[in-house]
Amino acid sequence: MAAAAAAVGPGAGGAGSAVPGGAGPCATVSVFPGARLLTIGDANGEIQRHAEQQALRLEVRAGPDSAGIALYSHEDVCVFKCSVSRETECSRVGKQSFIITLGCNSVLIQFATPNDFCSFYNILKTCRGHTLERSVFSERTEESSAVQYFQFYGYLSQQQNMMQDYVRTGTYQRAILQNHTDFKDKIVLDVGCGSGILSFFAAQAGARKIYAVEASTMAQHAEVLVKSNNLTDRIVVIPGKVEEVSLPEQVDIIISEPMGYMLFNERMLESYLHAKKYLKPSGNMFPTIGDVHLAPFTDEQLYMEQFTKANFWYQPSFHGVDLSALRGAAVDEYFRQPVVDTFDIRILMAKSVKYTVNFLEAKEGDLHRIEIPFKFHMLHSGLVHGLAFWFDVAFIGSIMTVWLSTAPTEPLTHWYQVRCLFQSPLFAKAGDTLSGTCLLIANKRQSYDISIVAQVDQTGSKSSNLLDLKNPFFRYTGTTPSPPPGSHYTSPSENMWNTGSTYNLSSGMAVAGMPTAYDLSSVIASGSSVGHNNLIPLANTGIVNHTHSRMGSIMSTGIVQGSSGAQGSGGGSTSAHYAVNSQFTMGGPAISMASPMSIPTNTMHYGS
C-alpha cells in the first residue's frame, strides 16, 4: 500500500508553481497568478474598503513554522506583504478566498480558481503546524510511528516493490478499466497515491479530474510522473494527509490501496473512510468491500520453530551466565509475533469464516475495536496450533465486480497470509466445533493488538494468546510450501517409477545400476497422487493454475458461519516468489527485491 498521509513540499494544484526560496534551507516559493486583493478596515467607526483593480501575482514563501505572503503588480511592485504563523488571525472565506487580520485592518485575498486556493491553503496549514488544531490522524498516531511510516513509503524502491506485485497492480487496473463508466468524465480522489499509479489508471478510464493525495515525499515524484506523462490538466497531486488537506470540490469515486496485513494493519483504512467527507452521496469506492478470512490450522513444524528459538534462553551457562530465568519471557515474545508467510492449504482444519467491512457504510470508529466471533466445524482430527488469516477485497462497479484475493489458493501477493499461534495447542476431532473470539484493538503505532480466545466445545479445553501485529515474524523463504505430513494416500516412490516412460538424468550424476542421465521434470510436473476426496473442500487443494481465468475474476473464498462461498479450480503452476529479509520493520505490506522476483508466465490470461 502507499502512504495516505505527511506533508512535504509546496502545493501542486491549479496554476501554482514552486521554485526554491531563500528564507531558509527548507523554504520554497509557490506562485499563484491572477489573485485579487481587498483591504477592509473600520477606522473611526466606519467600514472602509480598498480593492486593487488589477490582478496580482501572489507568492508564498514556505518555512518550517510560518509562511511569507507577498502580492506583486504586473510592474513587480509589492503591494502587500506579511508573515503568517500559528498566532496570526486568518481564515478561509468561501471556496477560493482567504482573509488575514493585521491590527485594525483585514485583507481578503481571492484566488483565480478553487484549485489555486486549495493548494495555497494546504501549504499554509503545513507551515503553521497542526498543534493547535490536531487532525484525526495526529490524534490516533504517535509522532515517531508516523515519521517512520512516511519515510518508509517515500522510497522509490518501496513503491517499486508494491508496483511489481503483478496481482495487486494488474487487478486494480483491470477493475478500473473494466468499469470505465464509473470513471468517464468523473471527479476522482486517490487516497495515498504513492507514485500515482492508480491515478494514471483512472485517467486511462477517462476521468476528467483526479486529486491525488500523498503525504510522504513520494508526492514530489508523483508530480514528476504527472508532468512527464502530460496529464497536469487532469491529475492534481496534493501533498499532505487526507485528514488535513482541502479539496476544491466533491468527488464521484474514491480509489485507494489501503490494505495492510490481515487487511487492517497500518490503519490506513481509517484514512480511506475519512476521505468519504469529499464523496458525493451517490459516489462509489474502489475497493468497495473487504473480507477478512480466518481458519484453524495445524503446523507442528512452525510451532516447534518458535519454541526452539526461545530455548536459547534456557541455557544454564551461556559464557558462564545462567539465562534460564528469561526463557518464559522469550516464549511469550516469540508467540506474540504473527507469522507472515504462505502455506499449503491442506494444513487448514475447517472452512474459513469471514468478517466483512463495507467501506461505503463503515465509519472510522468501527475500526477502533474489531470483534470477530467464530465457530468452526472441524473437518479433521489433530492439534490446532492457531488461526490463519487472509483477506479479499471487491471492486463493485457498474459493469462488473472484480476481486483481489490474498487466499492461500491464489497466486502469492506481497501481503502473503498471516498466522497467529497458540502457546498451548488444542486437540480437536473431526466433527467437533471450535468456537471463540478474535478481538483487534487499534493502537497509536498504526497497528492492532490482537486477542484470541478459542475452545473445543465438546471437551471444554481452551487456549488463548495476545499478539502484536506491529511486530510480525517474516518467515517466507521463496520456496513452495511443503504439504503437511500424511498428505500422501498412495506411494510417491511407486508413482515416480510407474509413469511408464524412460527418464534422462540431465544432472549427469552416476549411480550404480541407474542411467547416467535422468530427467525428472515429468515426475515433478505430475505431482503426488493425493486423494482430493480426503482433503478440505475449501477451493483448490493444489497449487493453482490460472490459465483458465482472468486476473481479478475470482470470487471471495470462505464461508459465513457455515455457508460455503468458495470457488475452486485445479491444475499446477509456479507462483510468484517475494523474498523477505530483515528490512521489514514496518509491519506493513512490503516485499524485498533483494533477489529478482519470479513472475509466473501463466497468471494473467484474458480469456473467459
Swiss-Prot record:
Catalytic activity: L-arginyl-[protein] + 2 S-adenosyl-L-methionine = N(omega),N(omega)-dimethyl-L-arginyl-[protein] + 2 S-adenosyl-L-homocysteine + 2 H(+)
Modified residues (N-acetylalanine): 2
Dimethylated arginine: modified positions: 550
Annotated control of activity: Methylation of H3R17 (H3R17me) by CARM1 is stimulated by preacetylation of H3 'Lys-18' (H3K18ac) H3 'Lys-23' (H3K23ac) by EP300 and blocked by citrullination of H3 'Arg-17' (H3R17ci) by PADI4.
GO MF terms, alphabetically ordered: beta-catenin binding; DNA-binding transcription factor binding; histone arginine N-methyltransferase activity; histone H3R17 methyltransferase activity; histone H3R2 methyltransferase activity; histone methyltransferase activity; protein methyltransferase activity; protein-arginine N-methyltransferase activity
EC assignment: 2.1.1.319
Domain spans labelled SAM-dependent MTase PRMT-type: 146-453
Tissue specificity as recorded in UniProt: Overexpressed in prostate adenocarcinomas and high-grade prostatic intraepithelial neoplasia.
Glycyl lysine isopeptide (Lys-Gly) (interchain with G-Cter in ubiquitin) crosslink site(s): 227
GO cellular component term, pick one: nucleoplasm
Residue span of region Transactivation domain: 499-608
Top-rank EC class of the record's enzyme: transferase
Annotated positions binding S-adenosyl-L-methionine: 159, 168, 192, 214, 243, 271
Region (Interaction with C9orf72): 27-138
GO BP terms: chromatin remodeling; methylation; negative regulation of dendrite development; positive regulation of cell population proliferation; positive regulation of epithelial cell apoptotic process; positive regulation of fat cell differentiation; positive regulation of transcription by RNA polymerase I; regulation of DNA-templated transcription
Residue ranges the record marks as coiled coil: none
Residues with Phosphoserine modification: 216
Compartments, as annotated in UniProt: Nucleus; Cytoplasm; Chromosome
Region ranges (Required for nuclear translocation): 346-379
Any single Pfam family the record assigns to this protein: CARM1
PANTHER family: HISTONE-ARGININE METHYLTRANSFERASE CARM1, PROTEIN ARGININE N-METHYLTRANSFERASE
Function: Methylates (mono- and asymmetric dimethylation) the guanidino nitrogens of arginyl residues in several proteins involved in DNA packaging, transcription regulation, pre-mRNA splicing, and mRNA stability. Recruited to promoters upon gene activation together with histone acetyltransferases from EP300/P300 and p160 families, methylates histone H3 at 'Arg-17' (H3R17me), forming mainly asymmetric dimethylarginine (H3R17me2a), leading to activation of transcription via chromatin remodeling.
Record text on subunit structure and interactions: Homodimer. Interacts with NR1H4. Interacts with SNRPC. Interacts with the C-terminus of NCOA2/GRIP1, NCO3/ACTR and NCOA1/SRC1. Part of a complex consisting of CARM1, EP300/P300 and NCOA2/GRIP1. Interacts with FLII, TP53, myogenic factor MEF2, EP300/P300, TRIM24, CREBBP and CTNNB1. Interacts with RELA. Identified in a complex containing CARM1, TRIM24 and NCOA2/GRIP1. Interacts with NCOA3/SRC3. Interacts with SKP2. Interacts (via PH domain-like fold) with C9orf72. Interacts with PARP1; promoting PARP1 recruimtent to replication forks. (Microbial infection) Interacts with HTLV-1 protein Tax.
This protein's name: Histone-arginine methyltransferase CARM1
Source organism of the structure: Homo sapiens (Human)
